Amino acid sequence: SDCKINKMNRLNLPPYEIKTRQQDGRQYILDVLRRKFIALTPEEWVRQHFIHFLADHKGYPTALLANEVELTIGGKKLRCDSVLYSRDLKPRMIIEYKAPSIAISQKTFNQIFAYNTLLHADYLVVSNGISHYCCKIDYTNRSYSFLSDIPRYEDL
Protein backbone atom coordinates (compact mmCIF):
# COMPACT_ATOMS: atom_id res chain seq x y z
CA SER A 1 0.00 0.00 0.00
CA ASP A 2 3.05 2.26 0.25
CA CYS A 3 3.93 2.18 -3.44
CA LYS A 4 2.21 5.50 -4.23
CA ILE A 5 3.57 7.14 -1.10
CA ASN A 6 7.11 6.24 -2.05
CA LYS A 7 6.55 8.07 -5.32
CA MET A 8 5.43 11.15 -3.40
CA ASN A 9 8.20 13.64 -2.77
CA ARG A 10 10.10 13.83 0.45
CA LEU A 11 9.21 17.20 1.84
CA ASN A 12 11.07 19.80 3.84
CA LEU A 13 8.59 19.19 6.67
CA PRO A 14 8.75 16.88 9.68
CA PRO A 15 7.42 13.36 9.09
CA TYR A 16 4.28 12.24 10.90
CA GLU A 17 2.24 9.07 11.16
CA ILE A 18 0.45 9.17 7.82
CA LYS A 19 -2.82 7.27 7.50
CA THR A 20 -3.70 6.25 3.97
CA ARG A 21 -6.11 3.81 2.40
CA GLN A 22 -6.55 2.27 -1.00
CA GLN A 23 -9.95 2.24 -2.71
CA ASP A 24 -10.80 1.34 -6.31
CA GLY A 25 -7.13 1.58 -7.24
CA ARG A 26 -6.80 5.09 -5.85
CA GLN A 27 -4.95 6.21 -2.75
CA TYR A 28 -6.51 8.39 -0.07
CA ILE A 29 -4.94 10.24 2.84
CA LEU A 30 -6.60 11.09 6.14
CA ASP A 31 -7.31 14.79 6.56
CA VAL A 32 -7.13 15.33 10.32
CA LEU A 33 -9.13 18.55 10.15
CA ARG A 34 -11.95 17.31 7.93
CA ARG A 35 -11.79 13.89 9.66
CA LYS A 36 -12.15 12.01 6.40
CA PHE A 37 -10.03 10.41 3.71
CA ILE A 38 -9.22 12.69 0.77
CA ALA A 39 -7.81 11.71 -2.64
CA LEU A 40 -4.03 11.76 -2.36
CA THR A 41 -2.65 14.41 -4.72
CA PRO A 42 0.74 16.14 -4.50
CA GLU A 43 -0.98 19.25 -3.03
CA GLU A 44 -2.84 17.17 -0.48
CA TRP A 45 0.43 15.48 0.50
CA VAL A 46 1.89 18.95 1.18
CA ARG A 47 -1.25 20.16 2.98
CA GLN A 48 -1.41 17.23 5.42
CA HIS A 49 2.29 17.52 6.26
CA PHE A 50 1.98 21.28 6.73
CA ILE A 51 -1.06 21.04 9.02
CA HIS A 52 0.74 18.46 11.18
CA PHE A 53 3.80 20.72 11.23
CA LEU A 54 1.68 23.66 12.47
CA ALA A 55 -0.18 21.60 15.07
CA ASP A 56 2.62 19.33 16.35
CA HIS A 57 5.66 21.59 16.02
CA LYS A 58 4.36 25.17 16.11
CA GLY A 59 1.54 24.84 18.66
CA TYR A 60 -1.38 25.79 16.38
CA PRO A 61 -4.76 24.64 17.81
CA THR A 62 -6.43 22.33 15.30
CA ALA A 63 -9.81 23.69 16.45
CA LEU A 64 -8.88 27.02 14.81
CA LEU A 65 -7.54 25.50 11.57
CA ALA A 66 -9.73 24.55 8.62
CA ASN A 67 -9.02 23.03 5.20
CA GLU A 68 -10.70 23.79 1.86
CA VAL A 69 -12.51 26.81 3.16
CA GLU A 70 -15.03 28.49 0.90
CA LEU A 71 -15.65 32.08 1.89
CA THR A 72 -18.15 34.43 0.31
CA ILE A 73 -17.16 38.05 0.62
CA GLY A 74 -18.99 40.81 -1.16
CA GLY A 75 -20.64 38.29 -3.47
CA LYS A 76 -17.27 36.74 -4.38
CA LYS A 77 -16.62 33.09 -3.62
CA LEU A 78 -13.06 32.35 -2.51
CA ARG A 79 -11.55 28.94 -1.87
CA CYS A 80 -8.64 28.87 0.55
CA ASP A 81 -6.52 25.75 0.96
CA SER A 82 -6.20 26.27 4.73
CA VAL A 83 -7.23 29.03 7.11
CA LEU A 84 -6.19 29.74 10.69
CA TYR A 85 -8.95 31.60 12.52
CA SER A 86 -8.67 33.89 15.50
CA ARG A 87 -10.70 32.96 18.61
CA ASP A 88 -13.49 35.24 17.32
CA LEU A 89 -13.37 33.33 14.01
CA LYS A 90 -11.80 35.95 11.77
CA PRO A 91 -9.19 34.65 9.31
CA ARG A 92 -5.71 35.28 10.79
CA MET A 93 -3.62 33.29 8.37
CA ILE A 94 -4.32 32.07 4.85
CA ILE A 95 -2.26 29.16 3.58
CA GLU A 96 -1.99 28.11 -0.05
CA TYR A 97 -0.29 24.92 -1.22
CA LYS A 98 1.40 23.98 -4.45
CA ALA A 99 2.70 20.60 -5.57
CA PRO A 100 6.41 20.10 -4.77
CA SER A 101 7.16 20.20 -8.50
CA ILE A 102 5.72 23.73 -8.79
CA ALA A 103 8.08 26.59 -8.00
CA ILE A 104 6.54 29.37 -5.94
CA SER A 105 6.50 32.57 -7.94
CA GLN A 106 5.30 36.14 -7.67
CA LYS A 107 2.12 34.97 -9.43
CA THR A 108 1.41 32.59 -6.54
CA PHE A 109 1.64 35.50 -4.13
CA ASN A 110 -0.45 37.78 -6.32
CA GLN A 111 -3.28 35.25 -6.02
CA ILE A 112 -3.11 35.11 -2.23
CA PHE A 113 -2.72 38.93 -1.98
CA ALA A 114 -5.86 39.31 -4.11
CA TYR A 115 -7.76 37.01 -1.73
CA ASN A 116 -6.46 38.97 1.18
CA THR A 117 -7.80 42.32 -0.01
CA LEU A 118 -11.15 40.77 0.93
CA LEU A 119 -10.10 38.68 3.95
CA HIS A 120 -7.67 40.99 5.79
CA ALA A 121 -5.68 38.18 7.39
CA ASP A 122 -2.46 39.13 9.21
CA TYR A 123 -0.36 36.34 7.71
CA LEU A 124 -0.13 34.83 4.25
CA VAL A 125 1.69 31.54 3.78
CA VAL A 126 2.58 29.67 0.61
CA SER A 127 4.25 26.26 0.63
CA ASN A 128 5.11 23.62 -1.93
CA GLY A 129 6.38 21.36 0.84
CA ILE A 130 9.99 22.22 0.01
CA SER A 131 9.98 26.02 0.35
CA HIS A 132 7.67 27.85 2.75
CA TYR A 133 7.07 31.58 2.62
CA CYS A 134 5.32 33.53 5.35
CA CYS A 135 4.36 37.13 4.84
CA LYS A 136 3.18 39.39 7.68
CA ILE A 137 0.87 42.21 6.68
CA ASP A 138 1.11 45.57 8.40
CA TYR A 139 -2.21 47.28 7.69
CA THR A 140 -1.31 50.46 9.57
CA ASN A 141 1.68 51.20 7.35
CA ARG A 142 0.27 49.44 4.29
CA SER A 143 3.34 47.27 4.00
CA TYR A 144 4.35 43.65 4.36
CA SER A 145 7.44 41.73 5.30
CA PHE A 146 8.59 38.18 4.74
CA LEU A 147 9.46 36.29 7.92
CA SER A 148 12.47 33.98 8.06
CA ASP A 149 10.36 31.17 9.54
CA ILE A 150 6.76 30.12 10.12
CA PRO A 151 5.97 31.72 13.51
CA ARG A 152 4.92 29.70 16.52
CA TYR A 153 1.25 30.15 17.34
CA GLU A 154 2.02 31.97 20.59
CA ASP A 155 4.15 34.50 18.68
CA LEU A 156 1.43 35.51 16.22
Regions found by a protein language model. Give the residues of each.
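A short, conserved, highly charged catalytic patch centered on acidic carboxylates
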Residues: 8-123, 130-156
